[in-house]
Amino acid sequence: MQDPNIETLFIIVHGKVQGVGYRHATVRRAHMLGVTGWVQNMENGTVQAMVQGSPDQVDHMLEWMRRGPPAASVTELESRREDGGRRFKHFAQH
């Protein structure tokens, strides 16, 4: 049974988000907030992430990802709720 206190979001970040430390900064922020999941660069220039945690933790992470680190320029952020039983143990950069 899915834990109602755990939320999982799949996120796609568009803009100047590669070559600017976005993934590394995302991992640092995830550790600060206590969320789990992963982040990776995609061939089309976007960054994708899976973020899992309490609704409050996930909201704070999403808010940060809309801005990213200082060198990034996020133009669009897509997110969708994932309904799956997979639980992540840590936050990883791929």
UniProtKB/Swiss-Prot annotation:
The keyword Hydrolase applies. Coiled coil: none annotated. Residues 8-94 form the Acylphosphatase-like domain. Residues 69-94 are annotated as: Disordered. It comes from the Bacteria. Residues 77-86 have a biased composition (Basic and acidic residues). It catalyses: an acyl phosphate + H2O = a carboxylate + phosphate + H(+). It holds the Pfam family Acylphosphatase. GO terms for molecular function: acylphosphatase activity. The active site is at R23, N41. PROSITE patterns: ACYLPHOSPHATASE_2, ACYLPHOSPHATASE_3. Its EC number is 3.6.1.7. It is an enzyme of class 3 (hydrolase). InterPro entries: Acylphosphatase (IPR020456), Acylphosphatase-like_dom (IPR001792), Acylphosphatase-like_dom_sf (IPR036046), Acylphosphatase_CS (IPR017968). Keywords: Hydrolase. Belongs to the acylphosphatase family. NCBIfam families: PRK14424.1. This is Acylphosphatase. It comes from Bordetella avium (strain 197N). The gene is acyP.
